[in-house]
Amino acid sequence: MRPNPRPRTGKSVPPVLDLPPPFRLVTLREVGDAFLHAQQVAAEEGAGTLVYVGRFDLAEFAVVLEPDEPLRVARKAFYAGMNALFDALLAHAPPEKPIAIDWPDAIRVDGGLVGGGRLAWPKDTAEDAVPGWLVFGGMIRTVSMTDEAGLHPLETALDEEGFEEHGASALVESFARHLMAAIDSWQQDGFGELTKDYLKRLSPEKGARRELGENGDLVVRWAATDQTDRRPLVDALETPSWYDAKRGGPRR
């Protein structure tokens, strides 16, 4: 990402995050949409812009990236974002707390859905053209808003799972640091290590050997039948599996 030390914040909310360079903070009120706003300002504000929404119940943020590869390859930056989000959760999780990714975008803690990641790019960009920007958006349910335990058995929140009580801001700060490490690894060592890290974090599928194609597709080889399935990343990103558009947050 292109470094730029200029601080930028929303008009109504002061900076609340301690971010490493080259990140620049834009803060929105609780009713804001970090993912949408980051797309709207990406071309003007550029790489390193991190949009954060101050919410009590969610860690909601989005970051602008500027790739130098064609879209079909650059889209794999999504996996760097997912690894960084996973690592941020791991850093604040209780010991031995199970965390897993449902390919490609949903994150579960001890089997319960807490949120996930999204990726956007200029829709008029051809697959073999370099996109002007990418936006990775993340959203994690930090606090449960229901008092009825067991009402939604397939979802959970960080407060219910014993996570450290540092709140959404600490999680996003941790994400930023881990994302920088992931991008540095990609630039220096190629995508291989990021691939390994991501694949080992996927929820298990019995009898499946999984790998990522050059364009980010998930390739699944079944030991029992010698059959191979290919799951296109671009199709999966079209409709995030974890996101409830009506609620504006993770599914229940």
Positions of predicted regions on the chain:
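Acidic (Asp/Glu) carboxylate-rich active-site/surface patches
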Residues: A93-A129, G138-M139
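N-terminal lobe of the biotin/lipoate ligase/transferase fold
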Residues: M1-P95, L113-V114, A120, L212-G216, ...
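Short histidine-centered catalytic/ligand-binding loop motif
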Residues: V63-K76, L154-A168
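Membrane-proximal amphipathic alpha-helices
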Residues: T228-P232
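Conserved, helical-rich catalytic subdomain that frames metal- and/or nucleotide-binding sites
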Residues: F163-G216
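Short, acidic (Asp/Glu-rich) active-site segment that either coordinates a divalent metal cofactor
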Residues: D128-E161
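Short polybasic amphipathic segments
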Residues: I107, G216-T225
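Non-catalytic alpha-helical scaffolds and adjoining flexible linkers that form interface surfaces
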Residues: P122, V135-G137, R141, L179, ...
